């Protein structure tokens, strides 16, 4: 065993000297025992980041360095961090090192383990077909449909509903498509991860899901690598079992943020807005592994926190370049009580073309966007002069647009305990039919309130009847 000793500790960054001159490879995992008074000794994992010269390496700690002292003995494992993969991971909760943290039984010692650092699939292995993934969420399926094996970004500031949307997607995919999901909690609230685990256990969805957490309270090393741990588990199901896997990452911004926290300590010059100079490379290494191959697919849905709602910030801007579809959450819509608060004009998808979704779907989607765009253009006039100054055609457009805007909202299954309303899953065909009828003016006589937080157009009619309206 190759052994060295700690020569410097700077928070989450630890320098180690190997006197025999045998330096461990970059990304190798090292271990060191931390002994604290009146406590059980703990094993700290370190990952090699830099060779410094003078027989020393600079490493990033995967857990707290409290109690670590200079001179402590360090052992080189001879390989990168490896985590369990396969059926043993389903229904379990792991940390960045692949250790179970759900108080259940340990993973068997003979279970297969894969390195978290792997090459992306080669060009020849990539799939070339485009297939739509039905989510049951109207605004997504109609205006920014998701692609199987694609990368989808959920953009939004703090508290506009990114995590709730992810939970609903996990629920819908598990219930309607019985697919395998991997959830990577990267630098988010521990309480949310805890709630998610118990909610998924109650609904039975957990049996089809592996969960990996490196939350806000953990050092940046864990937050930097936990997305790779989740991705490695997802890749096994794709490559060895030919499955279509969903990888949820909440939140990809925290992955970048963790990288920037250790970047300066590693001795790198900061780049724009203080981010690490290797931002694009780190993001590319992660994103290029998320793809469809000729064996199976990994579809990733990534929540992306937008600092101060500024979309030009380098972290969200770098992520944009990798995405096939974006779902933009808008604070103004959540303030109006429209949930999910998805902006129908800012959200985009590569799949929204007549060749992929079909001519009727494309025509209805563009009709909806055109109507909402016209309504937004008229809002200034309405604010200054009032509705009476509009032409009859514009009045009709405004009334229809308001109905469409309310109809883009719906109740979620995962929010039933808060709203008291039953969640709805709306198939794509039903969504297209419903919006086509609204655009054609078939339901102009129904009150706007009937369109709020419902599923299909048939539910709107039922709601209008319950309000005492002649249908």
Curated annotation (Swiss-Prot):
Q: Name one GO cellular component term.
A: proton-transporting ATP synthase complex
Pfam families linked to this entry = ATP-synt_ab, ATP-synt_ab_N, ATP-synt_VA_C
Designated name of the protein: ATP synthase subunit beta
Q: Which UniProt keywords apply?
A: ATP synthesis, ATP-binding, Cell membrane, CF(1), Hydrogen ion transport, Ion transport, Membrane, Nucleotide-binding, Translocase, Transport
- Detail which positions bind ATP: 156-163
What are the subcellular locations of this protein?
Cell membrane
What is the protein's quaternary organization?
F-type ATPases have 2 components, CF(1) - the catalytic core - and CF(0) - the membrane proton channel. CF(1) has five subunits: alpha(3), beta(3), gamma(1), delta(1), epsilon(1). CF(0) has three main subunits: a(1), b(2) and c(9-12). The alpha and beta chains form an alternating ring which encloses part of the gamma chain. CF(1) is attached to CF(0) by a central stalk formed by the gamma and epsilon chains, while a peripheral stalk is formed by the delta and b chains.
In terms of domain of life, where is this protein from? Answer: Bacteria
Provide the function of this protein: Produces ATP from ADP in the presence of a proton gradient across the membrane. The catalytic sites are hosted primarily by the beta subunits.
Q: What protein family does this chain belong to?
A: Belongs to the ATPase alpha/beta chains family.
According to its UniProt record, the EC number is: 7.1.2.2
Work out whether the entry's keyword set contains Membrane: yes
* Reactions the enzyme catalyzes: ATP + H2O + 4 H(+)(in) = ADP + phosphate + 5 H(+)(out)
Lineage runs: Bacteria, Bacillati, Bacillota, Bacilli, Bacillales
**UniProt membrane topology term:** Peripheral membrane protein
Its Gene Ontology molecular function terms?
ATP binding; ATP hydrolysis activity; proton-transporting ATP synthase activity, rotational mechanism
SUPFAM superfamilies noted in UniProt: C-terminal domain of alpha and beta subunits of F1 ATP synthase, N-terminal domain of alpha and beta subunits of F1 ATP synthase, P-loop containing nucleoside triphosphate hydrolases
Protein encoded by which gene: atpD
């Amino acid at each position: 065993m190759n052994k060295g000793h700690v020569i410097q500790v700077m928070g989450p960054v630890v320098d180690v000297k190997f006197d025999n001159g045998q330096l461990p490879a970059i990304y190798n995992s090292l271990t060191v025992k931390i002994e604290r008074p009146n406590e059980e000794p703990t094993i700290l994992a370190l990952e090699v980041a830099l060779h410094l010269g003078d027989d020393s390496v600079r490493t990033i700690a995967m857990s707290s360095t409290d109690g670590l002292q200079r001179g402590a003995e360090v052992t080189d494992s001879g390989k990168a961090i490896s985590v369990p993969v396969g059926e043993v991971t389903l229904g379990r909760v792991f940390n960045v090192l692949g250790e179970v943290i759900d108080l259940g039984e340990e993973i068997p010692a003979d279970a297969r383990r894969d390195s978290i650092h792997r090459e992306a699939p080669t060009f020849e292995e990539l799939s070339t077909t485009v297939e739509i993934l039905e989510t049951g969420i109207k605004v997504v399926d109609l205006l920014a449909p998701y692609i199987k094996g694609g990368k989808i970004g959920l953009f939004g500031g703090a508290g506009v509903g990114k995590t709730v949307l992810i939970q609903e997607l996990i629920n819908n995919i598990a219930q309607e498509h019985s697919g395998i999901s991997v959830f990577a909690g990267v630098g988010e609230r521990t309480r949310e991860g805890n709630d998610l685990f118990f909610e998924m256990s109650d609904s039975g969805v957990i049996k089809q899901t592996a969960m990996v957490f490196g939350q806000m309270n953990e050092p940046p090393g864990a937050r930097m690598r936990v997305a790779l741990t989740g991705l490695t588990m997802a890749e096994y199901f794709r490559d060895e079992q030919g499955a279509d896997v969903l990888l949820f990452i909440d939140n990809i911004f925290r992955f970048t943020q963790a990288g920037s926290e250790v970047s300066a300590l590693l001795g790198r010059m900061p780049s724009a807005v203080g981010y690490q100079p290797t931002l694009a490379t780190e993001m590319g290494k992660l994103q290029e592994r998320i793809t469809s191959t000729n064996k199976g697919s990994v579809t990733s849905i990534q929540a992306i926190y937008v600092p101060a709602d500024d979309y030009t910030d380098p972290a969200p801007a770098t992520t944009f370049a990798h995405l096939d579809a974006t779902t933009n959450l808008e604070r103004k819509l959540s303030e109006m009580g429209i949930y999910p608060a998805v902006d129908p004009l800012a959200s985009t998808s590569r799949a929204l073309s007549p060749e992929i979704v079909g001519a009727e779907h494309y025509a209805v989607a563009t009709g909806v966007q055109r109507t909402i765009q016209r309504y937004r253009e008229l809002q200034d006039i309405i604010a200054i002069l009032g509705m009476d100054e509009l032409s009859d055609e514009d009045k009709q457009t405004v009334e229809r647009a308001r109905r469409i805007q309310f109809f883009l909202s719906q109740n979620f299954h995962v929010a039933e305990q808060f709203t008291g309303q039953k969640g709805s899953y709306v198939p794509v065909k039903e969504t297209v039919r419903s919006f086509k009828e609204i655009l054609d003016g078939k339901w102009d006589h129904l009150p706007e309130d009937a369109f709020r937080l419902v599923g299909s157009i048939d539910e709107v009619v039922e709601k209008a009847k319950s309000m005492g309206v002649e249908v």
